[in-house]
């Protein structure tokens, strides 16, 4: 029986437009346990954050000849949680296969606020985007171990997670003189993930290994069905999604 967990502390410095800001954030990393059900069957259960958002940035705009004094703030919070159950089976002497079933849930909120505290004739503006996610995904893996001699062995493995569209509720709320709230049809996908790795073991006392993974974010789809140009721009122009490589 193996039990482990972890937490993270983040210190972030942001600069731009002559402004410098510091943000501190802490987050729960993971909680996992592993145990055997049978000499050929093992199981794992874990809870971990899949993504997190945490920022609060504000800026004061001094009055000019064309615009009054204003304050602008950007706030983001929330994230996705992942609960998984995995099982591995040794189907041959040297060959094992496994599968993880994960459940995702969580809310992510981002807001933009423009206030004109000293000018009654100027309307303040608030825009808030909330995404609620509740869905699942599957991961598959295979592992093969070859004994080279009595004290030397090599293990190779591969994992694959198929692309999956997340079930979500996407809501945009705006407030100027009145409040409007719209539920939109948004597409949020998790990418295909491929991974390979190997380890070398000497006499069960020394293990050396390496692994590589590829997350194909550039091929995942993100979009929203709306006639609001500002919302479409947030998806189509603000972000560039790149593949993620990890060694």
Specify the residue positions occupied by each region the protein language model found.
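Outer-membrane beta-barrel pore proteins
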Residues: 1, 33-37
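Transmembrane beta-strand segments of Gram-negative outer membrane beta-barrel proteins
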Residues: 1-13
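Outer-membrane beta-barrel porins/channels
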Residues: 14-20, 28, 36-247
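Extracellular/lumenal carbohydrate-interaction signature centered on repeated Trp-anchored short motifs
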Residues: 23
């Amino acid at each position: 029986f193996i039990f482990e967990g972890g937490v993270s502390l983040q210190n972030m410095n942001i600069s731009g437009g002559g402004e410098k800001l510091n943000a501190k954030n802490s987050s729960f990393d993971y909680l996992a346990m592993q145990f055997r059900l049978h000499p050929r069957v093992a199981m794992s259960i874990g809870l971990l954050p899949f993504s997190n958002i945490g920022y609060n940035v504000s800026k004061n705009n001094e009055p000019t000849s064309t615009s009054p004094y204003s304050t602008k703030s950007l706030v983001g919070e929330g994230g996705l949680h992942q609960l998984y159950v995995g099982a591995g089976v040794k189907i041959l002497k040297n060959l094992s296969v496994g599968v993880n079933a994960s459940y995702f849930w969580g809310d992510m909120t981002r807001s933009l606020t423009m206030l004109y505290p000293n000018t009654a004739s100027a309307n303040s503006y608030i825009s808030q985007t909330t995404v609620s996610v509740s869905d699942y995904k599957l991961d598959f893996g295979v592992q093969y171990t070859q004994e080279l001699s009595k004290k030397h062995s090599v293990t190779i493995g591969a994992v694959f997670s198929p692309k999956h569209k997340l079930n979500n509720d996407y809501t945009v709320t705006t407030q100027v003189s009145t409040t409007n709230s719209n539920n939109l049809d948004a597409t949020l996908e998790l990418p295909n993930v491929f991974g390979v790795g190997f380890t070398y073991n000497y006499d069960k006392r020394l293990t050396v290994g390496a692994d590589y993974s590829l997350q194909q974010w550039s091929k995942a789809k993100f979009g929203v069905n709306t006639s609001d140009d500002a919302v479409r721009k947030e998806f189509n122009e603000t972000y560039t999604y790149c593949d993620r490589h990890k060694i």
